[in-house]
A protein has these predicted regions:
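Bacterial N-terminal signal peptides
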Residues: 8-22
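N-terminal secretory signal peptides that target proteins for export/translocation
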Residues: 1-3
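Low-complexity, intrinsically disordered tandem-repeat tracts enriched in small residues
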Residues: 21-29
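Iron-sulfur (Fe-S) cluster-binding modules
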Residues: 321
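Beta-rich carbohydrate-recognition and catalytic domains
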Residues: 28-317, 328-356
């Protein structure tokens, strides 16, 4: 079954002539690495912002896009873009017929926290532990007690399973005081999802199909695999470092391209490493990272102060790029990178170019 998956694939026309012609050369700035990979911004603004609809709020992060499969009846559009509020109670949903927009918001969203098997109310905290949490100093808007007890679901990673005619979403939420884990949900239409109760592993899961297995990498670089994409994941190697944050995966032959960000960077930016996945997964190792994208424009946060990023929510307009997500066009071979801008203030799109 696993080889039938369309992993976050995007196909069809990418932008109208008018949209592309409106871009000045500076807006199409490409950042090139010594790995033969460059990233080119496709628009001079984000594709998702708070102005699109009041329902989505100010915190916008965690994109994942699918091309809606032909077997979905009466789709809202050709593409579904899932995203979240870092501390929100449902997975947001936008739709469009073109990756460059215009994007529209499906205000009810998709998966709701009440249907997720995660906590819907703050957990009880023992008085001594609560006192310790409250005594910790705030850090750029982060209150340790609030961070440890706020129910939410976030970080969707969405895939089309054509063989079983279902759409699969990995996501995470609060399962206890300071405890977050991931679960999975499925849908026949990409809007209404049914979650499964089994915790699968750590947060920020990103899935790929390889040699008959579903492999998952979660934060920070923890790998899992299972013959069943919905259950029974075994824990494998942990790569990268403890400060790794978000990641996106692209498999090409026996090479896994990992686009990722790191907590504490000034500014937080998107890196690229590769992993040779031809051998035993316990021997996998990542290459040294190279930078592929950093904030360069005000709408990406380049006008905000330079300061180290921190874990959890990005409050306000900050000088950070987060949440890389990869889309691959199976017909043209074009590869697209979505990412959160100015911390968690919107979602932008770029194209990834390979020398080969």
């Amino acid at each position: 079954m696993t080889r039938g998956w369309a992993i976050a694939l995007a196909c069809g026309l990418i932008g109208t002539g008018a949209q592309l012609a409106a871009l000045a050369p500076a807006d199409l700035a490409a950042q090139t690495t010594n790995t033969g990979v460059s990233v080119e911004r496709l628009l001079a603004a984000p594709i998702i912002t708070p102005d699109l609809h009041p329902s989505i709020g100010e915190n916008i992060q965690g994109p994942s896009v699918i091309r809606v499969p032909d077997w979905v009846q009466n789709p809202l559009g050709a593409y579904y873009l899932y995203f979240a509020d870092h501390k929100g109670t449902y997975i947001r949903l936008a739709y469009a017929d073109d990756l460059l927009g215009p994007w529209r918001i499906h205000a009810p969203g998709s998966l709701q926290i009440a249907d997720s098997y995660f906590l819907t109310a703050p957990p009880e905290v023992e008085p001594e532990r609560a006192a310790r949490l409250r005594a910790q100093p705030t850090n750029r808007g982060h209150d340790s007690f609030v961070e440890a007890t706020t129910p939410h679901i976030a970080s969707p990673d969405v895939h089309v399973d054509d063989e079983n005619r279902r759409i699969v979403m990995y996501f995470h939420g609060l399962d206890g005081v300071s405890r977050q884990v991931s679960r999975v949900a499925t849908s026949s239409d990409g809007i209404q999802f049914e979650a499964r109760p089994e915790p699968l592993g750590r947060t920020y899961m990103r899935a790929l199909q390889h040699d008959g297995y579903t492999y998952i990498m979660s934060m920070p670089g923890q790998f899992y695999r299972s013959l069943d994409p919905l259950s029974g994941f075994e824990e494998g190697p942990r790569l990268f470092n403890p400060d790794m944050r978000h990641a996106a995966l692209l498999k090409r032959d026996e090479t896994l391209f990992v686009f990722w960000t790191q907590v504490g960077e000034v500014p937080e930016r998107i890196y690229l490493s590769t992993i040779d996945i031809s051998g035993d997964w316990t021997a996998w190792a990542e290459t040294p990272s190279v930078e592929v994208l950093r904030p360069e424009f005000d709408w990406e946060g380049a006008d905000a102060p330079l300061e180290p990023s921190v874990r959890s929510t990005a409050y306000g307009h900050v000088n950070q790029l987060r949440d890389p997500a990869i889309l691959e066009d199976p017909e043209s071979g074009r590869v697209f990178l979505l990412y959160a801008v100015a911390g968690e203030s919107g979602i932008a799109i770029a194209e990834v170019h390979f020398d080969d």
